[in-house]
Amino acid sequence: MAQSSRYSNERVEKILAEMVQVLEKNQTPTDLSLMVLGNMVTNLLNTSVAPAQRQAMARSFADALQASVRDDPSH
């Protein structure tokens, strides 16, 4: 999801690679990977975001996800 961030690309890519490695190690099919990642997002929103901000944060995340899928013709 292309977006300006306070985190370096290097840090983001390192964490992403580690998460992909876990999914590959478990031979996780795409649908299960999406379920797990979706549950992780839900858990983060419910445990780390104030209740009044959760819906807006979820919408922002969903919008960014949809934009990144539309904007990436390489996949």
From Swiss-Prot:
InterPro entries attached to this UniProt entry: UPF0352 (IPR009857), YejL_sf (IPR023202)
Taxonomic superkingdom: Bacteria
Pfam families: DUF1414 (PF07208)
SUPFAM superfamilies (UniProt xref): YejL-like
UniProt family annotation: Belongs to the UPF0352 family.
HAMAP family, per the entry: UPF0352
Protein name according to UniProt: UPF0352 protein ETA_12580
